């Protein structure tokens, strides 16, 4: 309703100003500004919905001040460009319409009415309401009801008798199981859902809307609110250290806790969270690659669901035979947005909707088949009678190719339970949320019926029932929840552990690299993750007088303040203010002791602007002084004009990547010498090993043969045509996720370059 009202007020404002207000520069500028704000707000809402599927939320607030990288970001580039072009076009059209009758005499009354209507359209828009509530949540000091409703459970279950299998279905919300809306989409898992305790109204709250947040909510009974973006949790050394979560209780009660997934455990700090709360046995992409039947059978995120659930079944069987009390948690990935992935063992690899194939629906149909097969194996085993099986979505689906169809339905998360000890078939329509999942499971296992803000849906009352405005209530509790992290409020002395890649201060430990914003009463950690911008881009957003401590590889800060370290991949510590003084110190000991020293100096805005501009230089445009191309640092030597076909720097060097160019091309500013040696230190990937690799300069071509290990080879070139471009053409680029950033499309690797040096041998 408010959306229609805001649009009506917007149109009324445009029409009244365009046809009645007449010409006046001030009124035109004011009205265009407010109407433009309406347009920006609604385009932001549309874009946010596209990326998150949940409007303008915490994730969007973070993304507005950082970069969206990782996780299939390439698939969002075209929509992003489209949104930007639409914004320019709408602004141009709006200005043209408002000036249609600019030659008519000015009328103050109509101008004022148009401006008031424009202001009303902004105030009534859902985007403005969402942003207002989000900003309020950042500024509140907490909610007095938090202490009333936050409850810590007992640390043990008296006399536990049941094993637990807990399956997180990636984005596998209950909406998919509506057979009227999506006929025969989930027949296998839907049939199992109907055999158990099916909770039909599990809503999604703020801070529970992505995988690690959904896991925290379901096990600890709180949303994932942190003083940093939630997916950057991999940088912390402990996760809500004060909280008692489901895994802690299980471990204290004699359970061995296992977690199995196909993706890398480090992504979003799942390993840190699980290790912090009772899980001693973790299996992700790195751990599984040595035990799965086909290590090369992977998607962009890791191993397919059929592989992961096969390994989960092996774990279940072995643990059940051992007689040891255990919990086995597993997380699927094939239904990850934006398109999903199809396991090769599925019987149904295609699902049509609206008369055409839909990749996301197809992935859902396939994944639920794999999950159902896993559950049916457990049900058919002699150990089911001692087992509780839980199936839940980690969060609602984000913007995938099925999302517009999902939004036409009443959306809820999936949560159902199959009890081997006490079969029970019932659909429970009680209002609840994902924070209640862990408490409900704990209740069934014989423990308390509450964890944090979560309550058992079998014997307690959910916050979703207590508060009609439960989303706003949870946002009001955000400061209280952040305080549970027990983050330090000051930093004076700190220690950098060079071997463990950690920094410690005020009793807290963080993985490196790390950026800290330091104020009188707060230390704000800004980690680097797959979803966040590089730290130098985050630092570029600091105000001129903001105090910072930045721990990163030396070459990343050297271009600003320490040119002598431009080729160093060691750790360095920089601190200061972007508009004031900065220092860079080389970490030259295994245990390096540092102190903060922020000087209260005059702010130089020219220096500030220069620092910000330099921080924002993209990697490929960075230049350093060197007599060779060093590939394990960003940029290139000053003599290089541009290069292509080369992937990002890694600790050892860089791969060629045919996704970025069929050949490696390095164009120098000046012609290469008439006669020179080309010294190449490199290795080959896959089928490129032990094969001739063409290397060209002008009309002359040599061949290079590399093995799988790094070697140094010298080629002799004549350059009579004064060519300035070096071309290397790997013969058989291999599509692979080897060494890839999680969620990115596969790279096509050919050769791995460590160093290339041009040696002039002209007499």
Curated annotation (Swiss-Prot):
Signal sequence annotation: none
Top-level EC class: transferase
Listed GO biological process terms: glucan biosynthetic process
CC annotations in GO: membrane; plasma membrane
Similarity annotation: Belongs to the OpgB family.
SUPFAM superfamilies for the chain: Alkaline phosphatase-like
Function: Transfers a phosphoglycerol residue from phosphatidylglycerol to the membrane-bound nascent glucan backbones.
Record has Iron-sulfur as a keyword: no
Pfam families per UniProt: DUF7024, Sulfatase
Gene: mdoB
Keyword line: Cell inner membrane, Cell membrane, Membrane, Transferase, Transmembrane, Transmembrane helix
UniProt pathway: Glycan metabolism; osmoregulated periplasmic glucan (OPG) biosynthesis
Broad class of the protein's primary localization: membrane
Transmembrane segments: 4-19, 26-48, 76-98, 110-132
Phylogenetic classification of the source organism: Bacteria, Pseudomonadati, Pseudomonadota, Gammaproteobacteria, Enterobacterales
Protein name, as recorded: Phosphoglycerol transferase I
E.C. number(s) listed in UniProt: 2.7.8.20
Keyword Transmembrane helix: yes
Locations listed in the record: Cell inner membrane
Membrane topology field: Multi-pass membrane protein
């Amino acid at each position: 309703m408010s959306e229609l009202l805001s649009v009506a007020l917007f149109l009324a404002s445009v029409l009244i100003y365009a046809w009645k207000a007449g010409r006046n520069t001030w009124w035109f500028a004011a009205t265009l500004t407010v109407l433009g704000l309406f347009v920006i707000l609604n385009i932001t809402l549309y874009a946010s919905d596209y990326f998150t599927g949940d409007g303008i939320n915490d994730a969007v607030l973070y993304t507005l001040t950082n970069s969206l990288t990782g996780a299939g970001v390439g698939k969002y580039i075209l929509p992003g460009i489209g949104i930007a072009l639409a914004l320019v076009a709408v602004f141009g059209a709006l200005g043209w319409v408002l000036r249609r009758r600019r030659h008519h005499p000015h009328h103050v009354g109509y101008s004022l009415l148009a401006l008031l209507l424009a202001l009303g359209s902004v105030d009534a828009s859902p985007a403005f309401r969402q942003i207002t509530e989000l900003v309020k949540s950042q500024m509140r000091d907490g909610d007095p009801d938090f202490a009333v409703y936050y409850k810590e459970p007992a640390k043990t279950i008296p006399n536990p008798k049941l094993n637990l299998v807990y399956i997180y279905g990636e984005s596998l919300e209950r909406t998919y199981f509506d057979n009227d809306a999506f006929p025969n989409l989930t027949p296998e898992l839907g049939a199992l859902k109907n055999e158990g305790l099916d909770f039909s109204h599990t809503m999604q709250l703020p801070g529970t809307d992505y995988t690690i947040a959904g896991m925290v909510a379901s096990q600890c009974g709180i949303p994932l609110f942190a003083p940093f973006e939630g997916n950057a949790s991999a940088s912390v050394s402990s996760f809500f250290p004060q909280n008692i979560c489901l895994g802690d209780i299980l471990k204290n009660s004699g359970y061995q806790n296992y977690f199995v997934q196909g993706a890398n455990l480090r992504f979003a700090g799942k390993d840190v969270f699980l290790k912090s709360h009772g899980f001693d046995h973790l299996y992700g992409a790195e751990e599984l690659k040595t035990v799965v039947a086909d290590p090369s059978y992977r998607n962009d995120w890791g191993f397919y669901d059929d592989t992961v659930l096969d390994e989960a079944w092996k774990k279940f069987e072995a643990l059940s035979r051992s007689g040891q009390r255990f919990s086995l948690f597993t997380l699927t990935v094939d239904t990850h947005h934006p398109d999903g992935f199809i396991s090769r063992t599925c019987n149904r690899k295609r699902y049509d909707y609206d008369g055409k194939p839909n990749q996301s629906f197809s992935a859902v149909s396939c994944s639920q088949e794999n999950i159902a097969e896993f559950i049916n194996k457990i049900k058919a085993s002699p150990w089911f009678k001692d087992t509780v099986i839980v199936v839940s979505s980690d969060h609602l689906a984000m913007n995938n190719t099925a999302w517009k169809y999902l939004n036409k339905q009443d959306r809820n998360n999936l949560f159902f339970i199959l009890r081997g000890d006490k079969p029970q078939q019932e659909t429970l329509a009680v209002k609840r949320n994902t924070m209640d999942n862990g408490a409900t499971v704990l209740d069934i296992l014989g423990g308390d019926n509450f964890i944090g803000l979560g309550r058992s849906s079998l014997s307690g009352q959910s916050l979703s029932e207590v508060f009609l405005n439960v989303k706003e209530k949870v946002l009001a509790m955000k400061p209280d929840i952040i305080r549970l992290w027990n983050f330090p409020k000051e930093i004076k002395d700190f220690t950098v552990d060079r071997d463990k890649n950690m920094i410690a201060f005020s009793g807290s430990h963080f993985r490196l690299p790390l950026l800290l914003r330091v104020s009188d009463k707060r230390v704000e950690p800004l980690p680097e993750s797959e979803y966040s911008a590089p730290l130098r881009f985050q630092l570029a957003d600091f105000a001129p007088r903001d105090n910072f401590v930045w721990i990163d590889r030396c070459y990343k800060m050297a271009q600003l303040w320490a040119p002598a370290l431009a080729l160093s991949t060691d750790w360095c510590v920089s601190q200061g203010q972007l508009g004031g003084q900065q220092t860079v110190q080389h970490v030259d000991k295994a245990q390096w002791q540092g102190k903060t020293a922020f000087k209260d100096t005059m702010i130089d805005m020219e220096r500030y602007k220069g620092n910000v501009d330099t921080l924002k230089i993209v990697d490929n445009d960075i230049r350093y002084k060197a007599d060779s191309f060093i590939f394990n640092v960003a940029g290139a030597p000053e003599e290089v004009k541009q290069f292509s076909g080369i992937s990002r720097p890694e600790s050892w060097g860089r791969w060629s990547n045919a996704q970025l160019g069929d050949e490696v091309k390095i164009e120098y500013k000046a012609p290469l010498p008439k006669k020179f040696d080309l010294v190449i230190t490199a290795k080959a990937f896959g089928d490129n090993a032990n094969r001739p690799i063409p290397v060209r300069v002008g009309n002359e071509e040599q061949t290079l043969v590399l093995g799988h290990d790094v070697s140094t080879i010298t080629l002799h070139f004549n350059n009579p045509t004064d060519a300035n471009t070096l071309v290397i053409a790997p013969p058989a680029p291999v599509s692979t996720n080897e060494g890839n950033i999680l969620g990115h499309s596969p790279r096509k690797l050919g050769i791995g370059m460590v160093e290339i040096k041009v040696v002039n041998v002209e007499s």
